[in-house]
Each structure stands twice: as C-alpha cells, then as structure tokens.
Regions:
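The feature marks the mature, well-folded catalytic cores of soluble enzymes
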Residues: 1-183
Length: 183
C-alpha cells in the first residue's frame, strides 16, 4: 500500500478476515466501475463468505451496488476492463452462467462483455495478463496465442517470466513485482 499511497491514492484498510485467508485478494469479491460496483459470486466454496464482508464497504462508496445472484459463479481475477470492453476469462472459478449474468448487469452501464477461454492450469485470466493502457495488454504468450487480444497492442512476457504478466495499473502507473528484468 505504500507505493499506492505515494501516487496519491486513497487507501481503505480493512481488518483481516481470519476465516478467509484468501480475502487479501479483494479484487475477486467485486467489479468496481465508475457507475457502481458488482458483488461477485465465488467459484471456491472456501471464499463464499467474503462478499458479505465486502458488501457494506462498497455500499458506503457507491450509489449503486449490484450482485451476481447465481447459480453461476464469477471472480474479479477473471475480469479485465479495457477502454472499450470487459473481457472475462472462463476458469475453474468463473463459469458461463456467471459471465452471462455479469453481461446483463453491466449492459445497463453501457459496457460490452466478451468471454475468453483461458489455458489449462491458469487460475485466473489476469494471472496471465494486465492492462497497461486502454489499448495495450501485457500477456503471456500462452494466453495471447488464443487470439483473444488480436484487436489490441500486446507486449509479451519473456520466457520464464510469465508471472510478470500479473501487474496492477493505477491511473497511468503500472506496478509490477521485481524479478522480471526481461519483461
């Protein structure tokens, strides 16, 4: 959080949820857009209670908070919002029913959704890609090989540095873990 604070970002720190050790991955619980937030429905039973903990926080920040009601499941780690569309990867944690419900919810805000088949063995879509700017995506070669980014500029991770594709963009700043010098 120190790096984000240096950019001028306002950081909201939440108390740890001991019953949910994966709750540190807060992006999985909600999709936050300028128009409002959408609470996700986790595909992992061990994470099912996280959304209920995050909901009051988001309701305090957004005028409109919608919710994936099911039966489908979807997690934020499978969602990449670009300048022109919302890309969603189908994974072990995100299925077609969840994606369909999300498409219906974001349509009211003017967003178009496109789903992507992600390679086997990839936990989340954004494990293998990040948005660098509205038209440029940092991607592993294995994900980009599907053609899912054919309408974008793509920068590929170097061989052996696939984990470097998981970066965080904040306004015009891209934060990336150290240890990926070629990428």
């Amino acid at each position: 959080s120190a790096v984000l604070r240096e950019t001028g970002a306002e950081i909201i720190e939440l108390p740890p949820l001991e019953a949910y050790p994966d709750s540190v991955f807060v992006e999985d619980t909600a999709l936050c857009l300028p128009q409002g937030a959408i609470l996700m429905r986790s595909g992992a039973p061990t994470r099912a209670g996280e959304v209920a903990q995050m909901a009051p926080v988001l309701r305090g920040l957004y005028d409109e908070v919608l919710e994936i009601s099911g039966p489908g499941c979807i997690e934020g780690g499978d969602i990449l919002t670009t300048g022109r569309e919302v890309l969603v990867g189908l994974s072990e944690r995100t299925n077609r029913a969840g994606v369909s419900e999300l498409a219906q919810l974001i349509e009211r805000w003017g967003y178009r959704l496109r789903w992507i088949e992600i390679p086997q063995g990839v936990l989340h879509f954004k494990t293998d890609c990040s948005l660098l700017d509205n038209e440029t995506i940092l991607s592993t070669p294995r994900l980009a090989a599907s053609g899912c980014f054919s309408d974008y500029r793509v920068i590929y991770t170097a061989e052996g540095e696939e984990a470097g594709a998981n970066a965080i963009r904040f306004n015009t700043l891209v934060l990336m873990a150290a240890g990926f010098p070629k990428t």
